[in-house]
From Swiss-Prot:
Stretch list, region Fructose-2,6-bisphosphatase: 250-531
Organism encoding this protein: Bos taurus (Bovine)
Protein name per its UniProtKB record: 6-phosphofructo-2-kinase/fructose-2,6-bisphosphatase 2
Pfam families: 6PF2K, His_Phos_1
Gene: PFKFB2
Kinase among keywords: yes
Keywords tagged on the record: Acetylation, ATP-binding, Hydrolase, Kinase, Multifunctional enzyme, Nucleotide-binding, Phosphoprotein, Transferase
Similarity section: In the C-terminal section; belongs to the phosphoglycerate mutase family.
Catalytic activity: beta-D-fructose 2,6-bisphosphate + H2O = beta-D-fructose 6-phosphate + phosphate; beta-D-fructose 6-phosphate + ATP = beta-D-fructose 2,6-bisphosphate + ADP + H(+)
Tissues/organs with expression: Heart.
Length: 531
């Protein structure tokens, strides 16, 4: 039989592009995003200077780190785009009708962007960062969510401690775009008057009557007390758990790797080797550094591997061993050099270079698995004061990615050299990083991200050993949502029905029909070796 070479080539290219698009979709939707069976809108509530933006940014950073696509929509940004110059607190008076119209219009524009993010951009959670202090505004948001079948979870920040409020104004609001080139006294005076404007119409959530059926958490006086009401699902329970662990007290987190090991010298990954001579020198230098810093109540954590324990032993302090701080499990590639892996497992070597974050070693872990494993460490770090974590390269990359808000593309390639300390100091909306080298030579274990200079059509198609089940379709928007028991959508599946109608469907497909249709899709090729 004769065939058309051009047609065959075109089919191959189309096949590759289809698989490539699937991989892009897989990259956007990690295991954690499947914890949300419908998009969720987190709505902040509270007077100005109550830490709403702090909580919004911190919560968003955490959710993105665990793999749930999340984005903050700050209403102040929309307001500043609509009103180029801020003059005084008069803009926020409830009897300023013109300003009230502008503020409502800004809210509607922001909600339109929320809808686009959750329905068109593969977002799973949107954080609506605004005061939302009136029931009228909250009802507007609830109606918006009902129309789009979004779940809603309110986070109200309540604070009546004047010292905390004043500290927040001085730390954050003085540098706000609303106050260019103003002195502290004028800023404080204007902002306190702005708060009074909001107090006139402030209607806190009422768990006993008007708001008893809403899902929310009240955070009182920066975590002194909490009130939780009607949590709907797993992701909301994770949000509550996270918010109950964070604090704003000053502290410093120190991250470093163990001293250089014998396997580092040999270029081998994994294993449980001891320190080299230079590694022991680093341990002594680390002890001297900590003594000079005079850090109060410092806790030291290590993994359960020999090289971190030997590093901590030289410090002359008590330390805790965490098994979940052990290095990433390289499976069959443990105690091998990269050259040996490339020679013995060339396909695996290429697969890991293709997508390092998602790639899982045969019989081992991926970076995505490691992030899941390290979540309890992050929770405990958020609860603690001053801590030194002595860990490993992959582990340290995951921890750094959380504090520095780095995504899956950057995480596996963060530079974490041996004999270097990362000093992390939490600040208002992020983390200040200082890098301290202790002047003890060590081998370089970093591998740069490989560059692929081949045209897409010439790139070999490989099946990834993913850390999650690949999607059967790259179209994440039209994928039917299965709502959990006890938390039905406010308006069940209306967007899907509309889509089916547009395509000429007589009636909405049932779950069984959807499942049968999925089984008719071509199955992906089996992995190169079992996970």
């Amino acid at each position: 039989m004769s065939g058309n070479p051009a047609s065959s080539s075109e089919q191959n290219n189309n096949s590759y592009e289809t698989k490539a698009s699937l991989r892009i979709s897989e990259k956007k939707c990690s295991w954690a995003s499947y914890m949300t069976n419908s998009p969720t809108l987190i709505v902040m509530i509270g007077l100005p200077a109550r830490g709403k933006t702090y909580v919004s940014k911190k919560l968003t950073r955490y959710l993105n780190w665990i793999g749930v696509p999340t984005k903050v929509f700050n209403l102040g940004v929309y307001r500043r785009q609509a009103v180029k110059s801020y003059k005084s607190y008069d803009f926020f008076r409830h009897d300023n009708e013109e300003a009230m119209k502008i503020r409502k219009q800004c809210a509607l524009v922001a909600l339109k962007d929320v809808k686009a993010y959750l329905t068109e951009e593969s977002g799973q959670i949107a954080v609506f960062d605004a005061t939302n202090t009136t029931r009228e505004r909250r009802d507007l948001i609830l109606n918006f969510a009902e129309e789009n079948s979004f779940k809603v979870f309110f986070v109200e920040s309540v604070c009546d401690d004047p010292d905390v409020i004043a500290a927040n104004i001085l730390e954050v609001k003085v540098s706000s775009p609303d106050y260019p080139e103003r002195n502290r006294e004028n800023v404080m005076d204007d902002f306190l008057k702005r708060i009074e404007c909001y107090k006139v119409t402030y209607q806190p959530l009422d768990p006993d009557s008007h708001d008893k059926d809403l899902s929310f958490i009240k955070v009182i006086n920066v975590g002194q007390r909490f009130l939780v009401n009607k949590v709907q699902d797993y992701i909301q329970s994770k949000i509550v758990y996270y918010l109950m662990n964070i604090h704003v007290h000053p502290r410093t987190i120190y991250l470093c790797r163990h001293g250089e090991s014998e396997f580092n010298l040999l270029g081998k990954i994994g294993g449980d080797s001891g320190l080299s001579v230079r590694g022991k020198q680093f341990a002594q230098a680390l002890r001297k550094f900590l003594e000079e810093q005079e850090i109060a109540d410092l806790k030291v954590w290590t993994s359960q591997l020999k090289r971190t324990i030997q590093t901590a032993e030289s410090l002359g302090v008590t330390y805790e061993q965490w098994k979940i701080l052990n290095e990433i499990d390289a499976g069959v590639c443990e105690e091998m050099t990269y050259a040996e892996i490339q020679e013995q497992y060339p396909d695996e070597f290429a697969l890991r270079d293709e997508e390092k974050y998602l790639y899982r070693y045969p019989g081992g872990e991926s970076y995505q698995d490691l992030v899941q494993r390290l979540e309890p460490v992050i929770m405990e770090l958020e609860r603690q004061g001053n801590v030194l974590v002595i860990s490993h390269q992959a582990v340290m990359r995951c921890l750094l990615a959380y504090f520095l808000d780095k995504g899956a593309d950057e995480l596996p390639y963060l530079r974490c050299p041996l004999h270097t300390i990362f000093k992390l100091t939490p600040v208002a909306y992020g983390c200040k990083v200082e890098t301290i080298k202790l002047n003890v030579e060590a081998v370089n274990t970093h591998r740069d991200k490989p560059t692929n200079n081949f045209p897409k059509s010439q790139t070999p198609v490989r099946m990834r050993r993913n850390s999650f089940t690949p999607l059967s379709s790259s179209n994440t928007i039209r994928r039917p949502r299965n709502y959990s028991v006890g938390s039905r959508p406010l308006q069940p599946l209306s967007p899907l029905r509309a889509l089916d109608t547009q395509e000429g469907a007589d009636q909405p497909k049932t779950q069984a029909e959807t499942s049968r249709a999925a089984h008719r899709l071509p199955s992906p090729a089996p992995p190169t070796s079992p996970s």
